[in-house]
Amino acid sequence: MAQSTLYSRVLGTGSYLPPDRVTNQELADRLAKDGIETSDEWIVARTGIRARHFAAPDVTTSDLALVAAQRAIEAADVDPQSIDLIIVATSTPDFVFPSTACLLQNKLGIKNGGAAFDVQAVCSGFAYALATADSFIRTGQHRTALVIGAEAFSRILDFKDRTTCVLFGDGAGAVVLSASEEPGILGSALHADGSYSNILCTPGNVNRGVIAGSAFLHMDGQAVFKLAVNVLEKVAVEALSKAELASEQVDWLIPHQANIRIMTSTCRKLGLPQERMIVTVDEHGNTSAASIPLALDVAVRDGRIKRGQHVLIEGVGGGFTWGASVFRF
């Protein structure tokens, strides 16, 4: 008897945004107190962002991840103790170590000894984490995975740099994957080029009890834009090829929610109508690894994404890293 193909399938999604919603005007007013000039019009014209959410000082990345995880587990209708793999994509972990995934496992009360670890690929992190979990499930090493993108990016923003501090926000998104004979994740592609590490980075590190280097995010916006629009189309086409799908078979595109101009450019290059692109950057800002699963959950819960539809996700981030996955929801 021929052995059936094993897939990893999305059973449920969840997300969380901290309650402090900050509009462009509110942020501009805060910055003006330090002599930093910006405006709602300037931010919207360049990015499409109108608001973002910031976590309170005592709220950690694992706190954000916990709520998103609980909502995804509830939507998936699974026993938390059946989750034998937790992967958290984050660039803003609670600690140097242990991993945010281990902290989350404990907060969820999961005591089964399953694997838990973090993935750090910045804004591509969720694409990396999803593909990693898919590989573990397809090979039979794990059966049920909790995959999360979570960030408290406000912790590493320099609020004296108007070119970066207006872009980012905090939040978390999660999915529960489970082994299935029914097609789920159909193809993924991951890439990196470390020679571009300096164009988007937070170059500080802990050295003998002090921060060595800068603890704030640094970005060459023009270089990032140029590289992003070049690689996103290519990695999306590669993932579709592995899935044996044409772009016209994609029901929904969920790009990393960084900049509306990058997003619309990629959508256009793929030949997809703009109406098929999920957009949350206007309300969420750039939440790094959380942006894709946040947008996914929003579109699932508002009824746009339906069972049986093909969803293409793609991200690009510091490293430089980029990745894409296509799945049947």
From Swiss-Prot:
One of its GO terms (biological process) is fatty acid biosynthetic process. Residues 257-261 are annotated as: ACP-binding. PANTHER family: 3-OXOACYL-[ACYL-CARRIER-PROTEIN] SYNTHASE, BETA-KETOACYL-[ACYL-CARRIER-PROTEIN] SYNTHASE III, CHLOROPLASTIC. The keyword Thylakoid does not apply. Pathway: Lipid metabolism; fatty acid biosynthesis. It catalyses: malonyl-[ACP] + acetyl-CoA + H(+) = 3-oxobutanoyl-[ACP] + CO2 + CoA. It is an enzyme of class 2 (transferase). The keyword Chaperone does not apply. NCBIfam families: fabH, PRK09352.1. The active site is at C123, H256, N286. Catalyzes the condensation reaction of fatty acid synthesis by the addition to an acyl acceptor of two carbons from malonyl-ACP. Catalyzes the first condensation reaction which initiates fatty acid synthesis and may therefore play a role in governing the total rate of fatty acid production. Possesses both acetoacetyl-ACP synthase and acetyl transacylase activities. Its substrate specificity determines the biosynthesis of branched-chain and/or straight-chain of fatty acids. The last Arg residue of the ACP-binding site is essential for the weak association between ACP/AcpP and FabH. The gene is fabH. HAMAP family: FabH. InterPro entries: ACP_syn_III_C (IPR013747), ACP_syn_III_N (IPR013751), FabH (IPR004655), Thiolase-like (IPR016039). Homodimer. Its EC number is 2.3.1.180. It is found in: Cytoplasm. Keywords: Acyltransferase, Cytoplasm, Fatty acid biosynthesis, Fatty acid metabolism, Lipid biosynthesis, Lipid metabolism, Multifunctional enzyme, Transferase. This is Beta-ketoacyl-[acyl-carrier-protein] synthase III. GO terms for molecular function: 3-oxoacyl-[acyl-carrier-protein] synthase activity; beta-ketoacyl-acyl-carrier-protein synthase III activity.
